[in-house]
């Protein structure tokens, strides 16, 4: 299973924010600069992360973005659930004539659930804790 770039960059943005000192604000421009992604794409990603409570956005002169809750409370599996369309196959009877007897959808759904269950073993904090090589790459001190 390959994650969409939307989810990929959502995770990267969260990792960047988690690598900052607790509560420190950053900007969408800073995140886009670090990862080399378009500002327009990142705005959409941050809006989605904000809608689901993973990011807090503050407007104004001293505004910016930061994690919506502590990094140790953000499960990687939950992020993927919030960002990723998890339907692997299109099983409508209009599309596929074997749908009434097909077992593939159930198998694929079980695989997705196993994938998410494994991701639930890790938090955003696990991605950044004691990871000085990451801090250097992100230019975070």
From Swiss-Prot:
InterPro entries: TR_Rrf2-type_CS, Tscrpt_reg_Rrf2, Tscrpt_rep_HTH_NsrR, WH-like_DNA-bd_sf, WH_DNA-bd_sf
Domain called HTH rrf2-type: residue spans: 2-129
Record keyword Repressor present: yes
Feature: DNA-binding region: 28-51
Superkingdom, natural source: Bacteria
Record text on cofactor binding: Binds 1 [2Fe-2S] cluster per subunit.
GO BP, one annotated term: negative regulation of DNA-templated transcription
Gene Ontology CC terms, in alphabetical order: cytosol
Residues given in the record as [2Fe-2S] cluster binding sites: 91, 96, 102
Its job: Nitric oxide-sensitive repressor of genes involved in protecting the cell against nitrosative stress. May require iron for activity.
Alphabetical keyword list: 2Fe-2S, DNA-binding, Iron, Iron-sulfur, Metal-binding, Repressor, Transcription, Transcription regulation
A Pfam match: Rrf2
Gene Ontology molecular function, alphabetical: 2 iron, 2 sulfur cluster binding; DNA-binding transcription factor activity; double-stranded DNA binding; iron ion binding
Listed NCBIfam families: PRK11014.1, rrf2_super
Record keyword Oxidoreductase present: no
Cofactor field: [2Fe-2S] cluster
Higher taxonomy: Bacteria, Pseudomonadati, Pseudomonadota, Gammaproteobacteria, Enterobacterales
Name by which UniProt lists this protein: HTH-type transcriptional repressor NsrR
